Amino acid sequence: MTSNFSQAPLQLCYENVNASCIKTPYSPGLRVLLYMVFGFGAVLAVCGNLLVVISVLHFKQLHSPANFLIASLASADFLVGISVMPFSMVRSIESCWYFGDTFCSLHSCCDAAFCYSSLFHLCFISVDRYIAVTDPLVYPTKFTVSVSGICISISWILPLVYSSAVFYTGISATGIENLVSALNCVGGCQIVVNQDWVLIDFLLFLIPTLVMIILYSKIFLVAKQQAVKIETSISGSKGESSLESHKARVAKRERKAAKTLGVTVVAFMVSWLPYTIDTLIDAFMGFITPAYVYEICCWSAYYNSAMNPLIYAFFYPWFRKAIKLILSGEILKSHSSTMSLFSE
């Protein structure tokens, strides 16, 4: 007796290799669409953040402690776009890892390190904005270039050390050796982390996030009070002193910068919260999340690396002007670094 139903042949990542992972390919049309969407995100992350870095480093008018933090943040997002997203794109769409076990560990380590670096940068930027808004006249003496350098160093060194410890010592797999062995196959790159380290990861996301929420809540409260005070001062006295006028201008500028970077922080939290919650649920409830849901959460987080330059371009006229000068080749001219980017 023959069956009327034909079963689709099982596809493997490596057809002629024992213990190969099973391949679950998408339809050709969907594969093309996904490559376009994911590829666009990677290109945008690379090009957009490269423009931010070039702008801050080239134009002397942008050489400030706060902007150095922004350039360092853009460097982390640039590295996500160039060293993480392209390989994750192939893994997500082909459902196979074709780049070897050694690079799998390196890729996973870089993925975690650069993303935590972004989070640390944003946390320090929140501190910077809090000082700038609450005490704008004293701010230049408190948040100096050396302080900014210390913040940048911490934002890079701690994530790199932590990620290396997690992915290269094997400590994160303690207690789940059987699960790791069951998931191990040729053509896979699934780094499984035990519940303790997933909880640590969650706290590393939650604590800086809470710090940023508290600081920005205080920032906008102070900004509102300043706006009311300035409005009352102007309406009550037409002959405003030059000092008060200067203080009002400085406060207004810092409030605008805080608002822009506040949007950046919100974008980061919205992008990363689904992924963080998903990994927490999977670790404590037995990996119940469907693969496609995990991929959506993962790429939502990746796309955050491409969003910051778009936010800067929308809110910062100086960044739009810098982009024009860079793309037109004007920065190749002598003395271009001293060009004015701000309209007075």
Curated annotation (Swiss-Prot):
Extracellular topological intervals: 1-33, 89-102, 168-196, 282-291
**This protein's superkingdom?**
Eukaryota
All disulfide bonds of the chain are: 21-185, 96-189
Database matches in SMART domains: 7TM_GPCR_Srsx
Record flagged with keyword Cell membrane: yes
Q: Which cellular component terms (GO) are annotated to the entry?
A: plasma membrane
Which InterPro entries does the entry mention?
GPCR_Rhodpsn, GPCR_Rhodpsn_7TM, TAAR, TAAR_fam
Location in the cell reads: Cell membrane
Regions of this protein lying in the Cytoplasmic compartment: 55-67, 128-146, 218-260, 315-344
The membrane topology term of the UniProt record is: Multi-pass membrane protein
> What functional role does this protein have?
Olfactory receptor activated by trace amines. Trace amine compounds are enriched in animal body fluids and act on trace amine-associated receptors (TAARs) to elicit both intraspecific and interspecific innate behaviors. Ligand-binding causes a conformation change that triggers signaling via G(s)-class of G alpha proteins (GNAL or GNAS).
Protein name, per record: Trace amine-associated receptor 8a
**Which gene is transcribed and translated to give this protein?**
Taar8a
